[in-house]
């Protein structure tokens, strides 16, 4: 007798991945990356120019930091990543720490519970920050990390001062209406 065309069944249950938690994680990653602005908007050369004064520079810094914060974070992380290429141990530690941050801080739906005690976000943030600094400093790449952070901060500061803010949509509703072409006009 053959079982041609029959679907074999297993007597033991295979471990199933929690599809719901993966879906939530995917949604949170997309929501986090949704705050990233288009790179062509960030580097639009027609929107570059020197500020008229110190107050204009501070206004641009404040506006651009708020508007391009995810892009700036990506730039700083890329600078840190490239600075650690010659330190493979530090690069591995950095990569592991990024994954830990993603799962313990950014993708978490529910508060962390440890021995029936609930740990708040501020504590998680402080512990992860201290752990990140200590582990990266223990990898003997302190000079590279500090240099990369300073380089990233200088790049962000230069861009935020030079990038004009007049064409930025600070109101999300206006931005989505403008990009979707659903502009309404008052009827006469």
From Swiss-Prot:
<keyword id="KW-0472">Membrane</keyword>
<comment type="function">
    <text>May be involved in both secretory and endocytic intracellular trafficking in the endosomal/prevacuolar compartments.</text>
</comment>
<dbReference type="GO" id="GO:0005789">
    <property type="term" value="C:endoplasmic reticulum membrane"/>
</dbReference>
<keyword id="KW-0813">Transport</keyword>
<keyword id="KW-0963">Cytoplasm</keyword>
<keyword id="KW-1133">Transmembrane helix</keyword>
<dbReference type="GO" id="GO:0016192">
    <property type="term" value="P:vesicle-mediated transport"/>
</dbReference>
<comment type="subunit">
    <text>Interacts with PRA1F2 and PRA1D. Interacts with ACD11 and BPA1.</text>
</comment>
<protein>
    <recommendedName>
        <fullName>PRA1 family protein F3</fullName>
    </recommendedName>
</protein>
<feature type="transmembrane region" description="Helical">
    <location>
        <begin position="145"/>
        <end position="165"/>
    </location>
</feature>
<feature type="transmembrane region" description="Helical">
    <location>
        <begin position="123"/>
        <end position="143"/>
    </location>
</feature>
<dbReference type="InterPro" id="IPR004895">
    <property type="entry name" value="Prenylated_rab_accept_PRA1"/>
</dbReference>
<keyword id="KW-0256">Endoplasmic reticulum</keyword>
<dbReference type="Pfam" id="PF03208">
    <property type="entry name" value="PRA1"/>
</dbReference>
<comment type="similarity">
    <text>Belongs to the PRA1 family.</text>
</comment>
<dbReference type="GO" id="GO:0005783">
    <property type="term" value="C:endoplasmic reticulum"/>
</dbReference>
<keyword id="KW-0812">Transmembrane</keyword>
<feature type="transmembrane region" description="Helical">
    <location>
        <begin position="74"/>
        <end position="94"/>
    </location>
</feature>
<feature type="transmembrane region" description="Helical">
    <location>
        <begin position="95"/>
        <end position="115"/>
    </location>
</feature>
